[in-house]
């Protein structure tokens, strides 16, 4: 009996391969090629344009680290925006913070939202929560129209290809600063230091010119290229490394802890060299 294997070609010379039980859905949306597959090792997985976006097995790492680092850094996050993130995982984590009154999700591709609800219910299950406002719209344009509106903005985008290209520009980061309140914080995924070191260097440079507090932190995500993933955080006022212990409270997580919050900012030398 033949086996089906799916390979994501992460660079010209490197990729990740996984055994597939069956294809759940495949579609060319208005913006990208969407695939939902059931894999033997990582459960149901979402691919966009052939790239792993999330899997049932390891999704918690990414979503917890995008959400909880800025939300514990800010003393009272009430209004939060997620740009991208149509799978709903970041929203699920945001709603674990009782201070949050409203979480807005803006994703350009409604099909990602639709099929995440269908095939990734453990990830997308909170998208229908009454505190959540889901908008199928261009995140770049949404930011451009917003001013002094959000406490925290999280950019949960794909890699800088296709519809996400504009989400890695200095103009976009300037728009985020305008959309944030005077003590606002933002975080964005910024890929990995093994295959895209220039991206990290460029994003950090641009964000540092806009936000007085700019830092890089990492997490280990098996299905993402190289397994070592980075996040850039920009803050107008609050330092993520100066959060008092009394501010941390217990939430249900699998990866994020008070100690991980601090340890994530300890970088290997070759990574810290990228942002000097």
From Swiss-Prot:
Classification lineage: Bacteria, Bacillati, Bacillota, Bacilli, Bacillales
GO aspect biological process, one term: spermidine biosynthetic process
Quaternary structure and partners: Homodimer or homotetramer.
Organism: Bacillus subtilis (strain 168)
Location in or out of the cell: Cytoplasm
UniProt keyword terms in alphabetical order: Cytoplasm, Polyamine biosynthesis, Spermidine biosynthesis, Transferase
GO MF term set: spermidine synthase activity
Domain PABS as annotated: residue spans: 3-236
Name by which UniProt lists this protein: Polyamine aminopropyltransferase
Family: Belongs to the spermidine/spermine synthase family.
Active site: 156 (proton acceptor)
Binding site for spermidine: 63, 87, 156-159
């Amino acid at each position: 009996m033949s086996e089906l294997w799916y390979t994501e070609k992460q660079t010209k010379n490197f990729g990740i391969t996984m055994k597939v039980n069956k294809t759940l859905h495949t579609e060319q949306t208005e913006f990208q090629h969407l695939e939902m597959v059931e894999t033997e090792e990582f459960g149901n997985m979402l691919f966009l344009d052939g790239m792993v976006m999330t899997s049932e097995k390891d999704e918690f790492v990414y979503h917890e680290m995008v959400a909880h680092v800025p939300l514990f850094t800010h003393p009272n996050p009430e209004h939060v925006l997620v740009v991208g993130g149509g799978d709903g995982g970041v929203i699920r984590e945001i709603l674990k913070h009782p201070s949050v009154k409203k979480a807005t999700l803006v994703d350009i591709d409604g099909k990602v939202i639709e099929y995440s609800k269908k095939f990734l219910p453990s990830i997308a299950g909170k998208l229908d929560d009454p505190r959540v406002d889901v908008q199928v719209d261009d995140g770049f344009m949404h930011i451009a129209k917003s001013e002094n509106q959000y406490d925290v903005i999280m950019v949960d985008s794909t890699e800088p290809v296709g519809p996400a290209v504009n989400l890695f520009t200095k103009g976009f980061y300037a728009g985020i600063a305008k959309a944030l309140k005077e003590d606002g914080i933002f975080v964005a995924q910024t890929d990995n230091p093994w295959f895209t070191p220039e991206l990290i260097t460029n994003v950090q440079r641009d964000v540092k010119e806009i936000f007085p507090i700019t830092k890089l932190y990492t997490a280990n995500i098996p299905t993402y290229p190289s397994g070592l993933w980075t996040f850039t955080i920009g803050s107008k006022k609050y330092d993520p490394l100066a959060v008092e212990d009394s501010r941390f409270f217990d939430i249900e997580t699998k990866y994020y802890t008070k100690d991980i919050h601090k340890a994530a900012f300890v970088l290997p030398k070759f990574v810290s060299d990228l942002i000097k």
